[in-house]
Amino acid sequence: MSRRNAAEKRPVLPDPQFNNRLATMMVARLMKHGKKSTAQRILSDAFGLINERTGSDPIELFETAVKNATPLVEVRARRVGGATYQVPMEVRQERGTAMALRWLVNFSRSRNGRSMAHKLAGELMDAANEAGNAVRKREETHKMAEANKAFAHYRY
């Protein structure tokens, strides 16, 4: 491990188009090969589709989707005396949000659909309605933590 000081966390600035921090984080997760404008266009198009289909505010729906996909606990591997235990641990809010965004993007990419904007819009609408793969992944993570509750005393 490095002996230097840990890098300072830079503040996430709100997205210029939507004036929302989560939107900035989502653009960063969507971006491939440094193509930020493409990622911004995908998110903007997805929000347009959401507004078209539901008639509600896409930013509100997006925030609900992220909240519904955010895990509260996770399991982490811990070696104790030659055995590896899956130890349930609480997830910090920042990490939980990052995990939710990662899952939303990954499951959007693996969906069937025309464009990435269509796939992302579909996944966000599903997550906002407590359905979809990202929410299922959160439930799975919570079940794993519940099943391994006996090893909670190994927390570090």
UniProtKB/Swiss-Prot annotation:
Keywords in alphabetical order: Ribonucleoprotein, Ribosomal protein, RNA-binding, rRNA-binding, tRNA-binding
Organism of provenance: Prochlorococcus marinus (strain MIT 9211)
GO molecular function: rRNA binding; structural constituent of ribosome; tRNA binding
Stated name of the protein: Small ribosomal subunit protein uS7
Pfam families for the chain: Ribosomal_S7
InterPro entries tied to this protein: Ribosomal_uS7, Ribosomal_uS7_bac/org-type, Ribosomal_uS7_CS, Ribosomal_uS7_dom, Ribosomal_uS7_dom_sf
Disulphide connectivity of cysteines: none
Gene3D superfamilies found in the cross-reference section: Ribosomal protein S7 domain
Family: Belongs to the universal ribosomal protein uS7 family.
CDD domains for the chain: uS7_Chloroplast
